[in-house]
Amino acid sequence: IEMGRTAWTTLLVLAPAATVGLPAQRNRDRVFGLSQEEWCREARRSDVCEVREETVSNTRMVDVDARGNGGVHIRGWDRPDVHVRARVVVYADSDTEAKQIASEIKLVTTGGRIRVDGPSRDRNWWRDRGWSASFELEVPRNSELMVGATNGGVIVRDVRGRMDLRTVNGGLTLDDVSGDIRGETTNGGVDIRMTGDKWEGPSLEVRTVNGGITLALPPNLSAELEARAVNGGIHVRYPVTVRGLISSRRELRGTIGNGGPRIRASATNGGISITRR
């Protein structure tokens, strides 16, 4: 294909991509539903570790605020309520102080807004002590999700609905999802695995600043694809009909199958890999 000309072609392979970020792979390996003992064993440092549980009823919107230090793992189920587990980890100068801090930490689930409240965590407070909370949720499969995290990954599996998923330091993993989805991470990879012949919903848009993106697509998918890797290549092992101006190996616009909902993927410092699931 002559660069800079308008063209239609089906691509199977493009430029090699930069390494897709490891945080997304670690996300995928994360096991859901560990016992308290097993889950607490994963904590790097803890003087006190507890798992708190609550059930939330009559809510379709699930809003998880994990903007302390902890990740969020969500999976769909067939029940109408939301089951919440929060792993609370505390460290301090003494066991007595750690237990006191743990007693002040509360799991809040009011009106579908889920968070953990606890002692102030300013710079002086953090000097010799600290606490964090990670979440696991089972939600109805048609839930609307809003998730915010700072230091931790976000995983969503088997949910179909509107989603806004954001983290700063952590990977983003989506498996068997659909709907109207926006996902973003600053420092972490993005790993998406789709099922079905078409995306059930308006669009999917994901982006990362420092990390790569992997899209694993089912064989008979129909969608419109836009991919952009600013400082990395795009590696395609999937039939894509490319249209329009072909001027860069770092940008791709095309049609998969018969076309349909739009899939957008953007990486600033990292590559994009598009493969068959």
Listing of model-derived features with the role each one plays in the protein:
Residues 2-277:
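Intrinsically disordered, low-complexity terminal regions
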